[in-house]
């Protein structure tokens, strides 16, 4: 689903007032996000239902901390097949608004994924550099299958050599926050996704 521009400006009294003046506009409302997650859950369930029945194993959702935590929680409830969670933290950001391309593992998986059907759950794919590295890393651990689901995809992601099976929204190249997405650990608690006023990070 393509989103070409911000859907509305922030007006006084909205939850953006948690951070007065920081949110420039709303890109995706909470209702739009939840409706799309329901669609993704149904699609994923249809794709994995037979595999789950054949292998007798639950679909393993590998979530990249911290931004995707809210997304994977809602997504798992929308997928009509049993799922399990694994968490991994990698970083290529620091406190900037663009990917550095330098990836380091902050937290690795707690279990072996050999022979498992794995779905990587991402919050946003921008340059695709982090996801490309993560996909190679997990592939080397010999899962039965490996696919990617991201809530948001930015234009530059098309240049990454990674197939993304499930995309929530294609969005512009704006720096976005909310619904788990942060800038310097702030704004994750917003129920919607909005664009950050450039004065915050310039």
UniProtKB/Swiss-Prot annotation:
Its EC number(s): 2.4.2.8
Regulation: Competitively inhibited by acyclic nucleoside phosphonates (ANPs) with Ki values as low as 0.69 uM. Prodrugs of these compounds arrest the growth of a virulent strain of M.tuberculosis with MIC50 values as low as 4.5 uM and possess low cytotoxicity in mammalian cells. Inhibited by pyrrolidine nucleoside bisphosphonates, which are also able to arrest the growth of virulent M.tuberculosis not only in its replicating phase but also in its latent phase, and to arrest the growth of M.tuberculosis in infected macrophages while having low cytotoxicity in mammalian cells.
GO terms for biological process, alphabetical: GMP biosynthetic process; GMP salvage; guanine salvage; hypoxanthine metabolic process; IMP biosynthetic process; IMP salvage; purine ribonucleoside salvage; purine-containing compound salvage
Binding site for Mg(2+): 122-123
Catalytic function, reaction form: IMP + diphosphate = hypoxanthine + 5-phospho-alpha-D-ribose 1-diphosphate; GMP + diphosphate = guanine + 5-phospho-alpha-D-ribose 1-diphosphate
CDD domains in UniProt: PRTases_typeI (cd06223)
Taxonomic superkingdom: Bacteria
Family: Belongs to the purine/pyrimidine phosphoribosyltransferase family.
Subunit structure, as described in the record: Homodimer and homotetramer in equilibrium. The presence or absence of divalent metal ions, as well as phosphate, can affect the oligomerization state of the enzyme. Likely functions as a tetramer (rather than a dimer) in its biological environment, which is the most active form. The dimeric structure is also active though ~50% of that of the tetramer.
Name the record gives this protein: Hypoxanthine-guanine phosphoribosyltransferase
